[in-house]
Curated annotation (Swiss-Prot):
Part of the Sec protein translocase complex. Interacts with the SecYEG preprotein conducting channel. Has a central role in coupling the hydrolysis of ATP to the transfer of proteins into and across the cell membrane, serving as an ATP-driven molecular motor driving the stepwise translocation of polypeptide chains across the membrane. The gene is secA. GO terms for molecular function: ATP binding; protein-exporting ATPase activity. GO terms for biological process: intracellular protein transmembrane transport; protein import; protein targeting; protein transport by the Sec complex. This is Protein translocase subunit SecA. One of its GO terms (cellular component) is cytosol. Gene3D superfamilies: Helical scaffold and wing domains of SecA, P-loop containing nucleotide triphosphate hydrolases, SecA, preprotein cross-linking domain. It comes from Paenarthrobacter aurescens (strain TC1).
């Protein structure tokens, strides 16, 4: 079915390529004209194009001239002229597609033309890369082209403060990583003041390595979390004791491959008996399911001295690849606390989700999205279904010359690596450059020791120091170079045979103390000569390496994904260069062991000697089958993550939209009046639901009203007005109470002033929304954690999650309305009235008048207290999850709803009852 869908998706390829070629022809027709322009005239072209767009011309109509301007600017500033296929790739990006371009086709340069064209709208363009180093490098290098054309470029890096970030986003074109863009979006939606916002919208994004970012990393959502309120430690301790009474395969099941557990009926009964509850499936008990699952995982899936160690009474995570202790890292979603309870050490504060979004839903916010990669074909159907992105294969500038050899398979890892070292030694002796790909840091270091024993000089890259690695990878095509790298190391940097002239030139100018931003004019003046010298230096060596067969890529293991294998192969044979690739495998490799153990076992039992390589269709089929299983599992995980986040996303859009409008100064008076009517209507509906005026409990109704606002009308006055209890109707009661509430509100507004009241409305509603949304996220986390068990009760977990999530959202919105009204009536405030102040400014006029908004002070109306520590969880480059902990200075006590705050789980239980 997938292949059929892929064929259907590609039926329009010929038509699309024809359109792209027509664009390239139009751009080529303008080349001589733009070559004749002076630098100043090319710069003026930007102003002309921008004006034409403002006057109504579409960006598509401006594309040929804009692309021609960028091509000429790039030739003059970088000495790099766009090939026709690069212009075609750029046009594909502008049209909102994924441009599938092989490694070495210059994707970094491809992005400049569509980025420039779309920046003419003034709405900003985001170029998304896989790490900070590439973001900074590409921003600096391509920023020279943009600056030449009169545009600005910025770069978002992980440790920048908000002021710097705001400046970078204000640039015409901003580079950064997917994680940083996503976290800024979340932080903006936790902001208390408009001055804290850094992003300015989501207009157009170009995603480099789009398959890695939008596919591989999409299984892990972005999460900002902080210490949870309340004491949940008792439950962790309680459940660590409960699971000791449960037995695997009798009370619960464990799947080590998927790292999941499932509680069986017998186990559920034992837990219910132990806790003294009727039904673990009831909504009120949903939080308990998360504690139970984590306790079983801690018992069965997390092993002491393998996954973690205990040092000084603390649980410390061990990196599965390196064996190193990861100081400061903690497992998410209560897992760390469950392990602490299991080991009977101090249980530290649980983290609560403060804001979260999946990469899928973040990138779907952009008005237009595009991407580049060398390997998108295998995921074309998913790109279309999730992101509405078509994949357009762009022809190579020169025909591919690389030879991909068949795999060599050995019975075990030891003999496999012996054969790998022997192959490397032979090629190194001849001077052929070799790039060796491994699947983990541990394997890289193991191979490095074997190479050192043989006296083979080499570099080892483990995706830790991106700047150093990029410079080494760039020179990995030099004669005699041997580079061992994890599959992710040095991404985004081309390996050029004989060395990389561009990197050599940059290094030379850096030695001279020149910087492209600080010494812009000097740098531009020195660049052509430095680049020419570097090109000459690598030219002779390039010819030598060509004669040796080009770059040899050796894979020591098949990756879970065919795309990653293809990415590794694609390092060789760039721009029509010769090259060769081969994978060495063993039957004990993780992929074969976990996902095709039957085939591996049959081959292991064959009579072939251990040190003889196996080559058979059975091996090829086994590998393809194993990769298919993993890709299918990962695709299912992504689909599942998205299905559940889509439920939350609709709620998030509503809440974040409200917050943004409040921060931008919306007048909330009408909304507050709606809050008032809705809240009073709810109270009256509840009080008059049964019986008639004679039966209603007026004392209880007025007790409830007084918690909301200081009512001046009494129940007796309304009864007398109606002519007795029997003549009181719900509608009459409603009109009288609403009339009284509006009069009291009007009196409060007159007392503090209309302008002050509008500001108070904004501050209170923003504060209550912030607290209630965090509590809601907490409840939704626990709902999702336990929802899987509903399947045992013959109910669809997703449907249940949608239904209960909607009910919880409605309850939250009701609570926001009620609490906001309560604080607006009852909060004691101090007001400094608005005033116009005359300020001397030294101008000819001598002074000007500034309007100062009213200042409102009240207990709890300060900016909400920021957690002493925030934890950022995001996809890691290695395919796993990375966590960063950021300390924050504690602020003043928080929002006006603080006094009414209760532990979120208690509230969740109340609402569900």
């Amino acid at each position: 079915m997938a292949s059929l869908i892929e064929k259907l998706l590609r039926t329009g390829d010929k038509k699309t390529l024809k359109t792209l070629r027509n664009y390239a022809d139009s751009i080529n027709a303008l080349e001589d004209t733009f070559k004749s322009f002076t630098d100043a005239e090319i710069r003026e072209e930007t102003d002309r194009l921008r004006s034409r767009h403002q006057d109504g011309e579409t960006l598509e109509a401006l594309l040929p001239e804009a692309f021609a301007a960028v091509r000429e600017a790039s030739s003059r500033t970088l000495g790099m002229r766009h090939f026709d296929v690069q212009l075609m790739g750029g046009a594909a990006l502008h049209l909102g597609n994924i441009a599938e371009m092989k490694t070495g086709e210059g994707k970094t340069l491809v992005a400049t033309a569509p980025a420039y064209l779309n920046a003419l709208s003034g709405k900003g363009v985001h170029v998304v890369t896989v790490n900070d180093y590439l973001a900074e490098y590409q921003s600096e290098l391509m920023g020279r082209v943009y600056r030449f054309l009169g545009l600005t470029s910025g770069c978002i890096l992980s440790n920048q403060d908000p002021t710097v970030r705001r400046e970078q986003y204000a640039a015409d074109i901003t580079y950064g990583t997917n994680n940083e863009f996503g976290f800024d979006y979340l932080r903006d939606n936790m902001a208390w003041d408009a001055g804290e916002l850094v992003q300015r919208g989501h207009n157009f994004a170009i995603v480099d390595e789009v398959d890695s970012i939008l596919i591989d990393e999409a299984r892990t959502p972005l999460i900002i979390s902080g210490p949870a309120q309340g004491d949940t430690n008792r439950w962790y301790s309680e459940f660590s004791k409960v699971v000791l009474r449960l037995q695997p395969d009798v009370d619960y099941e464990v799947d080590e491959k998927k790292r999941t557990v499932g509680v069986l009926e017998a186990g559920i009964e034992k837990v219910e008996d132990y806790l003294g509850i009727q039904n673990l499936y009831e909504s009120a008990n949903t939080p308990l399911i998360g504690f139970l699952n984590n306790a079983i995982k801690a018992k069965e899936l997390f092993k002491r001295d393998k996954d973690y160690v205990i040092l000084d009474g603390e649980v410390l995570i061990v990196d599965e690849h390196t064996g190193r202790i990861l100081a400061g890292r903690r497992y998410n979603e209560g897992m760390h606390q469950a392990i602490e309870a299991k080991e009977n050490v101090e249980i530290k504060a649980e983290n609560q989700t403060l804001a979260t979004v999946t990469l899928q839903n973040y990138f779907r916010m952009y008005s237009k999205l595009a991407g580049m990669t060398g390997t998108a074909e295998t995921e074309a159907a998913e790109f279309m279904s999730t992101y509405k992105l078509g994949v357009v294969p762009i022809p190579t500038n020169r025909d591919m010359q690389r030879i991909d050899q068949s795999d060599l398979v050995y019975k075990n890892e030891v003999v496999k690596f012996d054969a790998v070292v022997q192959d490397i030694a032979e090629r190194h002796k001849n001077g052929q450059p070799v790039l060796v790909g491994t699947t983990s840091v541990e394997k890289s270091e193991y191979l490095s020791k074997l190479l050192a024993k043989e006296g083979i000089r080499h570099e080892v890259l483990n995706a830790k120091n991106h700047a150093r690695e990029a410079s080494i990878v760039a020179q990995a095509g030099r004669k005699g170079a041997v580079t061992v790298a994890t599959n992710m190391a040095g991404r985004g940097t081309d390996i050029m045979l004989g060395g990389n002239a561009e990197f050599t030139a940059i290094a030379e100018l850096s030695k001279r103390g020149l910087d492209p931003e600080e010494n812009s004019d000097e740098y531009e003046a020195a660049w052509p000569a430095a680049l020419a010298a570097a090109k000459q230096a690598v030219k002779d060596e390039h010819e030598e390496v060509l004669d040796l067969g080009g770059l040899y890529v050796l894979g020591t293991e098949r990756h879970e994904s065919r795309r990653i294998d293809n990415q590794l192969r694609g390092r060789s044979g760039r721009q029509g260069d010769p090259g060769e690739s081969r994978f060495y495998l063993s039957l004990t490799d993780d992929l074969m062991r976990l996902f095709n153990s039957g085939a591996a076992e049959r081959l292991m039992n064959s009579s072939v000697p251990d040190d003889v390589a196996l080559e058979s269709k059975l091996v090829s089929r086994a590998i393809a089958s194993a990769q298919g299983q993993v890709e299918g599992r990962n695709a299912e995980q992504r689909k599942n993550v998205l299905k559940y986040d889509d439920v939350l996303n609709r709620q998030r859009e509503a809440i974040y939209g409200d917050r943004r409008r409040i921060l931008e100064g919306d007048d909330l008076h009408e909304k507050v009046q709606y809050f008032l009517e809705d809240t009073i209507n709810s109270l009256i509906d509840a009080a008059t639901a049964e019986g008639s005026g004679d039966d209603w409990d007026y004392n209880q109704l007025w007790a409830n009203l007084r918690t909301l606002y200081p009512a001046t009308v009494t129940a007796q006055e309304i009864i007398d007005e109606a002519g007795g209890k029997s003549r009181v109707t719900a509608e009459f009661l409603r009109e009288e109470i609403l009339s009284d509430a509006r009069l009291v509100y009007q009196a409060r507004e007159e007392a503090i002033g209309s302008e002050s009241m509008r500001e108070l409305e904004r501050r209170v509603v923003l504060s209550v929304i912030g607290r209630k949304w965090q509590e809601h996220l907490y409840e939704m986390d626990y709902l999702k954690e336990g929802i899987g068990l509903r399947a045992m009760a013959q109910r669809d977990p997703l449907v249940e999650y949608q239904r209960e999530g909607f009910v919880m959202f409605q309850s939250m919105m009701e609570a926001i309305r009620e609490e906001s009204i309560g604080f607006l009536y009852n909060l004691e405030v101090e007001v400094t009235p608005a005033e116009d102040v005359v300020v001397a400014d030294g101008s000819a006029a001598g002074a000007h008048t500034e309007h100062h908004d009213p200042q409102i002070r009240a207990a709890g109306l300060e900016a909400p207290e920021k957690p002493a520590q925030l934890q950022y969880t995001a996809p890691g480059e290695d395919g796993g999850t990375q966590t960063r902990i950021e300390g924050r200075a504690s602020g003043r006590s928080g929002n006006p709803a603080k006094a009414a705050s209760q532990e979120p789980r208690k509230q969740a239980k109340k609402k569900r009852r």
